[in-house]
């Protein structure tokens, strides 16, 4: 029992099922952040996640969301100033009822950033049905001095020196990927 000697920590734990879900969510995001690392998560005696670690983000995405969805994803690649954006974004036909399938990574770190999630959603403008959200795994790289990771104790939030330019780069990256996927009339 990990917290047997520290009862103050134990009281903040959720149920076993809730803690298991939190571990699976974390492992899922890091599998998408590091496709070159093999992940295997077993929960309740069953395999919840297995990735090959072959370095292909599309293969990691398939392990998380299924081969069909991975095949539908669009490649995202864009650079603007010191910001580079890469990853996968779904076409407008691939969407979810919440933002949980939007994974954003900054310099290899999974972050929960409302401005960046908004930039991803904003790139789709009116292409998604109301109340629906895109599926995406977006990797943002920029110099360390352009981002502050010491905003949250868990390092889950970041602050940018120029948040607008980072958001603009994300929007442009996804918009370009979507434009490249549209059929020509």
Which residues fall in each region the model found?
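N-terminal phosphate-binding caps/lids of nucleotide- and nucleic-acid-binding domains
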Residues: 1-185
């Amino acid at each position: 029992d990990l917290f047997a000697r520290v009862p103050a920590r134990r009281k903040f734990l959720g149920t076993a099922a809730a803690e298991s879900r939190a571990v699976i969510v974390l492992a899922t995001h890091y599998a998408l952040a590091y496709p070159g690392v093999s992940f295997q998560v077993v929960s309740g005696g069953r395999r919840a996640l297995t990735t090959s670690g072959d370095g292909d983000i599309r293969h990691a995405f398939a392990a998380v969301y299924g081969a069909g969805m991975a095949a539908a994803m669009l490649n995202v690649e864009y650079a603007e100033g010191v910001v580079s954006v890469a990853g996968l974004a779904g076409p407008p036909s691939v969407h979810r009822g919440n933002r949980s399938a939007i994974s954003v990574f900054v310099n290899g770190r999974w972050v929960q950033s409302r401005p960046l999630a908004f930039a991803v959603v904003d790139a789709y403008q009116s292409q998604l049905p109301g109340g629906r959200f895109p599926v995406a795994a977006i990797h943002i790289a920029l110099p360390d001095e352009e981002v502050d990771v010491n905003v949250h104790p868990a390092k889950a939030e970041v602050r940018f020196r120029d948040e607008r330019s980072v958001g603009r780069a994300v929007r442009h990256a996804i918009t370009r990927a979507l434009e490249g996927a549209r059929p020509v009339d």
